[in-house]
Amino acid sequence: MAPELKTEVNIISKVIQGDLESLPPQVREFIESNAKLCQPESIHICDGSEEENKKILDIMVEQGMIKKLSKYENCWLALTNPRDVARIESKTVIITQEQRDTIPIPKTGSSQLGRWMSEEDFEKAFNTRFPGCMQGRTMYVIPFSMGPIGSPLAKIGIELTDSPYVVASMRMMTRMGTAALKALGNGEFVKCLHSVGCPLPLKEPLINNWPCNPELTLIAHLPDRREIISFGSGYGGNSLLGKKCFALRIASRIAKEEGWLAEHMLILGITNPEGEKKYFAAAFPSACGKTNLAMMNPSRPGWKIECVGDDIAWMKFDELGNLRAINPENGFFGVAPGTSIKTNPNAIKTIFKNTIFTNVAETSDGGVYWEGIDEPLPPGVTLTSWKNKDWTPDNGEPCAHPNSRFCTPASQCPIMDPAWESPEGVPIEGIIFGGRRPAGVPLVYEAFNWQHGVFIGAAMRSEATAAAEHKGKIIMHDPFAMRPFFGYNFGKYLAHWLSMAHRPAAKLPRIFHVNWFRKDSQGKFLWPGYGENSRVLEWMFNRIQGKASAKSTAIGYIPADTALNLKGLEDINLTELFNISKEFWEKEVEEIKQYFEGQVNADLPYEIERELLALEMRIKQL
């Protein structure tokens, strides 16, 4: 007979899988107190097995939450409520006693570097949402490891959720189940609580059989208590709490305390024709090609690129002073639109088995489709859009949601690095920052030193497709590509990065900035991008080896005249690609100054202020 969990309100939650008695006391207490609060009908402790996964998928099919894609092996399609399609920054908060622990106090207006909520306001919000929120549903207990199980850099979390979609996705995105629980023992874990906020019986029918509660959505982080509490959204970024919530917001705070870095960065290995290998980490804002770079097929003969991770890096200096990085994830949660054989052949080779697609279009022959897939539809095959309606190009709107996703196991990617799961991590020798800058910013430049490199990360800006009320594109500040993900005050984060230079024996990686997106006066890209970006990586590789020459400019080192290998490329206008215009950079300096003064204000480290002044002086002398 399954053990029953008695609660004060006499709601009984049956344990339908697993054994509460055998769990570590602090895990059991976490489950019991939340079961008492949320009142699920049953409790399922996940073991991560293949058999369990089949059961979870069957439950979702039965609920109409996913459907099988007959064209591929073990692939599924979920269509969400159109109001639950992305991360929601306005509803993502961090709770600390003091506002300044979370964000710098801006000079005027509100902070763009995070959202703080007071403990009192959070308590009220929590109490209006969670009591009874899982009635009629199963509470799944998901023990998971961020990072290879047993790695000294890994951390354990436990997520309680009432969404089977979260269970199936977390099984791909993390190392989930019994092994994670064993690794935890009686240790510390990050407590993650998630509910879609739709107790049964429903008050109103679901849209697309997708439970969510957009009015009451809230994603809250309590770094002092190592807790994440998410309500009302089933979408990945808000519900797969190991991803941005834990691996960036909570982890960046843990990293500050423990002396390491948790960053929004891909990790790749690059090997030259002589068989020498180096690892790079790279931070780009969303939609600037992180996944494409991490999985690139280099155009340069004899060069090889392998992928360690496409989104998040945890990096710590070892005893020898090497900066060691792990990918804390176990899968890819990638944006589907724009993914094609041309833009990312290795992603295409990864995603057509054991994958959950969300909000892409479906073909009448049981396949998937999206903008930029670059595959003509076979004759007679029709499309159903992500809104579950018949679709033709005349509809005037995209067939797949612009933020539609694939969730797929990393182990299926044909170019995973042999060391991608190595417990000690891979040694990072170069860090790359980048953004989408149509004007003014050269293809590549190198920082003069670590401090200058930290300044470059802090000053990152990138073109964003603005919300509907703006016409055209705007250039947004996105420092370190972490703007939506800082777990604590950005000024203190900069100080933490700067402090790495004072570590005894630290071998500091070189820092670079790239811009694949510069355009000419006709609006055409000046650089072909994709596999040709390997030429830029080749220059960086050779710089680290002390082999490639560079010339010093006002903004950093750029490749000397013949240092960038352009063999086999036609019509590359190097002059325009590397032009550093005084007028442009004067405006850029002014923009950065306003941003630092307005947003980071009193918390801006003086070293960063000094770097800005030095840049201003160098620009004046152009």
UniProtKB/Swiss-Prot annotation:
Q: How is the cofactor bound?
A: Binds 1 Mn(2+) ion per subunit.
Quote the HAMAP family the UniProt record gives: PEPCK_GTP
Q: Spell out the note in the miscellaneous section.
A: In eukaryotes there are two isozymes: a cytoplasmic one and a mitochondrial one.
Q: Which organism is it from?
A: Gallus gallus
Question: Which terms in the GO cellular component ontology are assigned?
Answer: cytosol; endoplasmic reticulum; mitochondrion
- Region Omega-loop: start and end of each range? 457-487
Q: How is its activity regulated?
A: Phosphoenolpyruvate carboxykinase activity is regulated by glucose levels. Phosphorylation at Ser-90 reduces the binding affinity to oxaloacetate and converts the enzyme into an atypical protein kinase using GTP as donor.
Query: What gene name does this entry carry?
Result: PCK1
List cofactor names only.
Mn(2+)
- Pathway assigned in UniProt: Carbohydrate biosynthesis; gluconeogenesis
Q: Which family does it belong to?
A: Belongs to the phosphoenolpyruvate carboxykinase [GTP] family.
Name used for this protein in its record: Phosphoenolpyruvate carboxykinase, cytosolic [GTP]
Residues at which substrate binds = 87, 235-237, 286, 403-405
Decide whether keyword Cell inner membrane is in the record. Answer: no
Concerning Pfam families, the annotation shows: PEPCK_GTP, PEPCK_N
Q: Which InterPro entries match?
A: PEP_carboxykin_GTP_CS, PEP_carboxykinase_C, PEP_carboxykinase_GTP, PEP_carboxykinase_GTP_C, PEP_carboxykinase_GTP_N, PEP_carboxykinase_N
CDD domains listed in its UniProt record: PEPCK_GTP
